[in-house]
């Protein structure tokens, strides 16, 4: 490596193939992480291997096949990672850019080994999650440090734990939204990936997230609360564009149970349709690359039963 430093981009992961067994393998690795499914180990093992994966892999593999088909038989997450890596390698003089997935491939273990073969003076670890969550950024940190600690020589490490307040991130979203006629839409829906309420409650030493009014109160205490960060992201983008706060809705998708962050995206869209507010613009500021959640789950096709004549996905 001619460049003296390494930049490691990390995203969540994707199945190697859109098949039942490949999806099973991905889900098993993902859900076996205690930071993702925070229940006692024996219960987690039973749920993952005998309840969740055997059944969910079947339905999920069908969705991944649909996703692959739309993207020339490849994972969009891998495609975007390769593109980003190539662009940054061309632009950064001092850094050799690598990317890894927290789950599946390319694995953190193999990519860290490739980095260490080049004896870098510094590794900058950049999890591609704008808002901190233990189940994403926290998990990447633990997995990365576990692997790196196996090496005798440990270089300087810089770890980026969240970046949603970075003005360039906000400007990028504002620029993208500016390409739409925002006045033509009844509502602008900011849809973030959901989390169990228990995950955000653990951010606080005392009390619960619900006690903090995280929808409008952003401070030092809740700066790593995913719910607060999500609402804050919406506010920053809304203010950058000079949008009326009443026009913007923050919500959360991909829930597994009712005990996840609310309001739920599907419920919000159903309510908007019922109230005859049918020109909707949807964006997903928790995602830095398209994947199943943005190309399939939020896709307009998913909401045809709502009779929304105009629903645009940013």
Regions found by a protein language model. Give the residues of each.
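C-terminal functional regions that serve as terminal interaction/effector modules
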Residues: 280, 287-302
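A short, acidic, amphipathic alpha-helical segment used as a generic capping/interface helix at domain edges
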Residues: 109-112, 257-277, 302
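N-terminal glycine-rich anion-binding loop in soluble enzyme alpha/beta folds
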Residues: 3-99
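Long, hydrophobic, well-ordered secondary-structure blocks that form the structural core
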Residues: 98-172
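Conserved small/polar residues in nucleotide/adenosyl-binding loops
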Residues: 304-310
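A structural motif corresponding to the C-terminal end of an alpha-helix
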Residues: 84-96, 151, 233-247
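Redox- and metal-dependent alpha/beta enzyme cores, enriched for Fe-S-associated oxidoreductases
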Residues: 197-245, 256-263, 268
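Charged helix-capping and loop-helix junction motifs
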Residues: 140-143, 263-267, 296-300
